[in-house]
Structures are given as C-alpha cells and as structure tokens.
Amino acid sequence: MSLRIAARTNFSVLKECEDWLIVDKPAPLIMHPTGKSDEVTLLGVLKDAIPGVEFFFVNRLDRETSGCVLVAKSSSVARKLGKMMGRREIKKSYQAIVSGWPDWKEVCVTEPIRRKGEFEESEIWVKQAVHPEGKASETGFRLEGIFKNGGDRFAMIGCEPRTGRTHQIRVHLEYLGYPIVGDKIYSDQGRAYLDFLEKGWTAELFERMRLDRQALHAKGVIFGWKGKVIEAQSLLPNELESFCIA
C-alpha cells in the first residue's frame, strides 16, 4: 500500500530587504514546478504570500532538504548574488544526521564528483559518485554529536560545501561510509529509491529509511551586502530534532 507524504508549506522568512529574502524551506516541498503535475512548490507559495514580486532562487535545495534558501527579487540582484556564489563569497552551512559513529572529529573531502551513469551503468540517472575524472569538489565535515535511536548508532555532522556540485554533501558522506539517514539514493545502494519509484511510499520503506525525508538541513547562510554582514540561521526541524532525542 502506497502512503502519501504531504508537502509541508509552512515556510517562514528569516531575513528580508528590498533586494532579496532568505526563506526557511520545509521538506519535502519542491522548489519550482516540474511541468509534470500541479504539485505545491516553494515558488508558488512565495507568489501567493507576497504577490507582485518576481522571485529568483540563488541557491537550490533538494525536495527533501530543508532550510535556508536565498531568493532575489529581481534578475539584476540574482545575477550579482550568483556571481558572489561563484566566488565563494556566500558561505552556507548544513547539518546532516548520518548512520554510524565517525572516528574523526573533522575531515575535509576533496574527491571529484561525476554523474555515475557517465562511467558505469546506473539505474538512477541523477545519481552522482566520486570519480577521478569528475568535477573538483570540496566539503568540510565536523562531528557535532553522537546518539542512539532504537539501539542503532547515529551522528550529527556539520557540513560546509566549498563547491556546488549536485548532491555534493550526500555523495561525500556516502564516500566516507556515513550515509545520510533517509537518503533513498545514497544509502542502501539506491534500492530504496527504486522501490519508491515502483511502489511509492510504503510502511516497509519508512521502516528501512527511519524518516520520511533525508536528514539534511541547510542551517545557515552568511554574506556581505551593501557594507553589512548578513547572517541567517534556521533551526533544525521538529522531525529531525525528535529523531535525535528518541
């Protein structure tokens, strides 16, 4: 029996000025229309909440990732912020709950990333992987805490992506041997994702994944704007907080 996971749409505005706003995106809210359905999107709820403004996403989060999204209110501001992002002048920080207890306090992963289907057969088109001929990638990780849930070991990891590759944090954590809880593509060798496509969300899949979303949260963003340092922080969502203290 397939279960339906309703999109959470109760986003909040963390910071705002005449040029941009930073919103706190819930999961599993998708960012923008895909053309395949009339599914609720962050772009749609923004337009409903703040009519008359054209929005441009400066950074993007996967459907199942929550947290800070920087949104420009004009194309010119979007271009400027995009260039700042390319120059690494916008710093982003994440939190991830992973399976297992790492034996390190801090580690920096610089393994290049490439779409897996480009170098070997993959049933999941979008899946990425570490590969020597991939694009240069760098992520810093910091162990923030360890805990148990249902007798199993888990850890909270602080993540700082220093490049912007697709699924970068998820790929590098899988490479380290500590996949993100609830990640259907980069844990269980992707079998959960294929099962989800075939059967939808089921009670059996929830039992395997432990969460109805991947445990990755865009915690903060910091950048300079018109002579001021802008910083926004998003609290860990209730469903992830509850998992840590269960």
Regions found by a protein language model. Name each.
Residues 1-138, 142-151, 229, 235-246:
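RNA pseudouridine synthases
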Residues 38-42, 46, 145, 151-223:
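Pseudouridine synthase
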Residues 224-228:
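Short strand-coil-strand connectors
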